[in-house]
A protein has these predicted regions:
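A transmembrane-helix-recognition feature enriched in membrane-embedded lipid enzymes
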Residues: 1-54, 101-106
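Generic beta-sheet signal
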Residues: 62-68, 108, 134-140
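Membrane-embedded segments
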Residues: 73-130, 134
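A cross-family acyltransferase "interaction/gating" segment
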Residues: 99-100, 147-236
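Soluble extracytoplasmic domains of inner/organellar membrane proteins
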Residues: 119, 126-136, 140-153
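Aromatic (phenylalanine/tyrosine) cluster motif
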Residues: 273-275, 285
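Short, intrinsically disordered C-terminal tails of secreted or membrane-associated proteins
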Residues: 298-301
């Protein structure tokens, strides 16, 4: 209970400190508008005891659309901790207490599925993010699941993204990269099907209860897997693209689940990103762009712009 209170107090203090800084950065279009969310979510993951391993590489090609699976509110801080991104979210998120404000400060694009006549405005906003060089994250399932499986991808969401491409680039083309977030371990032990929903937040689950339970469980191991990017043109068949992305994300998720808490190929050609829980407790947490090894500054693992 004491740990939960201390963590909550630290998160509140950090949030109150960074909100005005991020707001000013957005108004001034300063580079820090991308870096502040990365640093904030890294610190948040560290405080929550989330340990992340990154498999594969995020492409540096732009414009870039990332299509991922979705099982928890934790997906957002985890993805942002490893890459400076913006999200496409449903309109209801904008009205959620605190989470809605944080989503706005991360320059999320909100989609109102009930107001089809607003589609043009939404597409223009997505196009603006792509033109600015921001990787845009789209949750292909359109909802969250229990984390044990990848739900069918909604072709309408892919179609909406395609419509935005025409405005984003003269040729209407973009790179689209599959992305998987898989919760694989708890306190160093493999997280099986029965316990994976401990990390998931879906249906009508209460946020406060889920947050409290998360603090009780200890260190949570997560694998973030980057798939091979594919070119996506305005004339592409959205159904075929959606099926391909769904298959790739499902394959990445299954590979991570079978690989246990270290994910597939641990110790081989992976890109480890494990400072979150343990290094933060040792006082070794570093802000994006300020990581030091042997007294020398090195680039952060999220290749911040």
């Amino acid at each position: 209970m004491l740990r939960a209170l201390l963590v909550a107090a630290a998160i509140v203090a950090m949030t109150l400190f960074l909100i005005p800084l991020q707001w000013i950065s957005i108004l001034l279009r300063a580079p820090t508008r991308r870096l502040i969310p990365v640093g904030y979510h890294r610190a948040l993951c560290a405080l929550l005891g989330i340990r992340i391993r990154v498999m594969g590489q995020r492409t540096r090609l732009r414009p870039l659309l990332l299509v991922a699976n979705h099982s928890s509110w934790l997906d957002v801080p985890i993805i942002t901790a490893v890459a400076p991104v913006v999200f496409v979210a449903k309109q209801e998120v904008a009205s959620w207490p605190l989470l809605g404000l944080l989503a706005k400060l991360q320059r999320s694009v909100f989609v109102d599925r009930a107001r089809r006549h607003k589609t043009g405005e939404v597409n223009a906003e997505i196009a603006q993010r792509l033109n600015d060089g921001d990787p845009v994250v789209l949750f292909g399932e359109g909802t969250s699941s229990d984390g044990n499986r990848v739900l069918p991808f909604r072709t309408a969401l892919i179609g909406a993204a395609r419509d935005a491409l025409a405005a984003a680039t003269p040729g209407g083309g973009v790179m689209i990269q599959p992305l998987s977030i898989t919760y694989v371990g708890l306190n160093g032990l493999p997280l099986g099907r029965q316990h994976r929903p401990l990390a998931a937040w879906y249906g009508d689950m209460d946020f406060v209860s889920h947050f409290r339970d998360l603090l009780r469980h200890g260190v949570l191991d997560v694998v973030v897997s980057w798939g091979e990017p594919i070119p996506y043109q305005a004339e592409s068949d959205r159904k075929a693209v959606a099926r391909s992305l769904e298959s790739r994300v499902r394959g990445l998720t299954l590979a991570a689940q079978r690989g246990g808490r270290h994910g597939p190929g641990a110790g081989s050609a992976s890109q480890p990103f494990l400072f979150m829980a343990k290094e933060a407790k040792r006082g070794r947490f570093v802000w994006p762009g300020l990581r030091r090894r042997g007294g020398r500054r090195t680039d952060p693992p999220c290749d911040a712009p």
